């Protein structure tokens, strides 16, 4: 499974010199687009495809992702979560599950400085074939496979400081069905995290609101110091997605439900 914010490649216009100098790569867009681009329905194109294209052309996060060479607008969600919760630090070991097309992996590489000597280590893993990201070990493998945790620890030379998951199954339009499918991925990602996280580690995962997340949160509270929920500004309006941030991993020996829920 891959990040829900579609296969957008890097590139795009360079923008003006003043604009380029006023922002660092990885910063969120400021302001809004002045002109609205309206797309006509072409012959053979479905109305839903036209609406999607029009939304993309008028989305400041899509435009800014292209300008900065980021592979998806979803990268800004991780940027905003990191700025709020201080998730990524130089030298950290990070795994990005469902990494394709690589937007979150790009941000993890930059903020852990994995391209630098003595920097961090980043592994991106996805069941789909995907283009690698410089500074990361990019694996095409199903993280639900029994051998995946051992494979990851081998690539990391040890346990992990942060597990990221922006995975979402293709939506059906039926809210409860979509909720259950995303929660299945979230639960699988958490069970994977239990096997690879180092003490004190953290976990970030997308869920869809829908009422069945209680059992997972209860389990997480037994193993982490604090659980938070957040909806970053880059999440689209009307989207049911929210992110669970678990910090202070204690492991399977955590015992009773002592974690704080600071939603």
Curated annotation (Swiss-Prot):
Q: What GO cellular component entries does it have?
A: cytoplasm
Q: Which residues form the active site?
A: 206
Subcellular localization(s) per the UniProt record: Cytoplasm
Q: Where is this region: Disordered?
A: 1-34
**What GO terms are given for molecular function?**
rRNA (uridine-2'-O-)-methyltransferase activity
User: What sections of the protein cross the membrane?
Assistant: none
**Which reaction is catalysed here?**
uridine(2552) in 23S rRNA + S-adenosyl-L-methionine = 2'-O-methyluridine(2552) in 23S rRNA + S-adenosyl-L-homocysteine + H(+)
Provide this UniProt record's keywords sorted from A to Z.
Cytoplasm, Methyltransferase, rRNA processing, S-adenosyl-L-methionine, Transferase
Q: What class of enzyme is it?
A: transferase
What EC number(s) does the entry state? 2.1.1.166
Source domain of life is Bacteria
- Which InterPro entries does the annotation name? RNA_methyltr_RlmE, RNA_MeTrfase_FtsJ_dom, rRNA-MeTfrase_E, SAM-dependent_MTases_sf
The positions annotated for binding S-adenosyl-L-methionine are: 102, 104, 126, 142, 166
HAMAP family per the UniProt record, alphabetical = RNA_methyltr_E
Q: What is the stated purpose of this protein? A: Specifically methylates the uridine in position 2552 of 23S rRNA at the 2'-O position of the ribose in the fully assembled 50S ribosomal subunit.
Indicate the family of this protein.
Belongs to the class I-like SAM-binding methyltransferase superfamily. RNA methyltransferase RlmE family.
Protein name (Swiss-Prot/TrEMBL) = Ribosomal RNA large subunit methyltransferase E
This protein's species is: Rhodospirillum rubrum (strain ATCC 11170 / ATH 1.1.1 / DSM 467 / LMG 4362 / NCIMB 8255 / S1)
